[in-house]
Amino acid sequence: MGRVLRILAPNPGPFTLEGTNTWIVGADPAIVIDPGPSEPQHLEAVIDAAGSVGAILLTHHHLDHAPGAAWLAAHTGAPVLAARPELGEREVVDGAVIEAGGVSLHVVATPGHAPDHLAFLAEHEGWLFTGDTVLGRGTSVVDPPEGDMAAYLRSLEALLELRPRRLYPGHGPVVERAPEWLAEYLEHRRMRERQVVDALGRTKEPRSPAELASEIYAGYPDELLPAAARTVLAHLQKLQDEGIVTEDHQRFALAGPRGSNTT
């Protein structure tokens, strides 16, 4: 069985938690997942821990995950593999298998947090590298227009069907009770959607995502509310596509008899 090491990037924050997890998988040569920011001291620590590097994988293009890939590739000669061709030497797609360091990683497309988001499954070991689709603590932001709530929920369902034993997230601790955590993640998002619908149902006045977030996320730190409002917007756009809500100038109401607009 291969090894998994974590090198924590020095970019802590409200959304990155302790920082970005750079994962080193296998050995001689190792696979590096999400080099993180282009910070030489961090990337040198990755090389020191990895030894030889056979491939550099990106879960998605966001600035806390991908920029260090170019530096790491230049200093190791390893190819960068990503869903977006401009990010790497090779484009990888759902169902591809990447082998290095005694580990086979199956590529799983997981759009939602970002359109190019990938997860990587070591099927034999039961390891799932989730990027930002699932964090080790708290929940992930789904921020339109890149963030797509319908796609995100489908991705969570797909990961749950894989029945992994352990999750290695993009931020936060390793999750040992993987199926339970994935199920909780999925139910949490469904709960938030119900809360959005219920909040709209309490008034006939159209409401903005920020107004809804202030109610639904009451008690959350003020600095997190703008991101919460973006995730509420993602829920609203999904509900609008389903004909459950209507939108006028970024204000939303229930469609039909319960809302301010009737059909």
Predicted regions and their residues:
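Conserved beta-strand hairpin/beta-sheet module of binuclear metal-dependent hydrolase folds
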Residues: M1-A49, A119-G131, G136
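Active-site HxH/HxHxD metal-binding segment of metal-dependent hydrolases
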Residues: N11-E18, P37-H106, G126
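C-terminal regulatory/interaction regions
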Residues: A199-T263
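Histidine-centered divalent metal-coordination motifs
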Residues: T59-H65, H113, H171, H235
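A short catalytic or substrate-binding loop motif that flags glycine-/basic-rich loops and adjacent residues
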Residues: P14-L17, P111-A114, N261-T263
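Metallo-beta-lactamase
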Residues: A30-V32, P37-E39, S104-P111, P115-A199
